[in-house]
């Protein structure tokens, strides 16, 4: 889904987009074909059981073939479609690494060769990419995880400020007010929710002490638990069951608390400042969910197999009594897709300027603490949020300071320009 979000923005900027997908149960090929050209690879001969596998072995089983065979299938599909060159190859698969990437580049054989964007969050294998995106949060380690895994010249876009969200999130980010009272809960554990955490959550919310809470439940029609969840929804007043949604933005914006999984929806909730209770339902969700919990950006309840209805009920009771569940609102402003599109295609439109606004505080702090910025600053130590807040607040009312934010064609902030005048001397910071 994140690749579709990126593809939409690239197409809006004039790029020609194609997807290469292997046929398998539950694939999204027909959905993608409604918008894009899709080249489908031959299906797996038989789905091997992967229940006992983990780590690299598990991700290799997801691929279903050797990386060399998969690359040959991709190249064959491209050749049959008459595609012999590309400006960028975008790969988003845990089972692929530098060997597949090398085979694809060499197999296309175009001059110049295609550049390569890798989307990853595992940091457990080598890549030969020109651009790497990892939109997840790992605390102080966020900027260091890919050392030695990518070429020295690879540009790394790391952290939630690059989260691939739909354009509605950037528009709503400055408009949604902070939550001050718990009145409405959003329940979403993914479209399928194999472990039926949606049902468990509703069982917890059937307790009379939560009767005043309105509840929005989102679940895909293909979920094996849809009917049982619908039955629970019918037992609870002021509770609505929603089927598949083109975007969760409206439901997130009107909720006061969310409970859900720790996947990509984490950044949608954070962008709109929604305090969240999180259950890690997949192994790759746990590391960054733990980091977010430790930093106070959400409350991690635990991993899927460890959470009971009683624990869920207790978590809701605590959320009612103490408004201490983090939201992560400062982590992302919703412009990640635009930032990545600009990194891929460049800035080919005039840049506009606007005055800095109160809502820019978190963004300016992220920029100031970027490793490249700190390395070229008078002090290489990260700026603390409390110190930055005092400096930022003073600057907003300082008549001797002019601070501007350049915007790209999508109105995405791409930098800052500051003019200061002190005792007849002027300084410029870019």
Task: Briefly describe each language-model feature range.
Residues 266-311:
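Catalytic binding pocket for nucleotide-activated donors in carbohydrate/polymer assembly enzymes
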Residues 253-264:
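Acidic donor-binding loop of glycosyltransferase active sites
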Residues 127-196, 222-227:
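A nucleotide-sugar donor-handling region in carbohydrate enzymes
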Residues 381-429:
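Acetyl-CoA-dependent GNAT
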Residues 173, 179-255:
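Donor-nucleotide binding loops and adjacent catalytic segments primarily
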Residues 13-72, 302:
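Conserved nucleotide-sugar phosphate-binding/catalytic loop shared by glycosyltransferases and other
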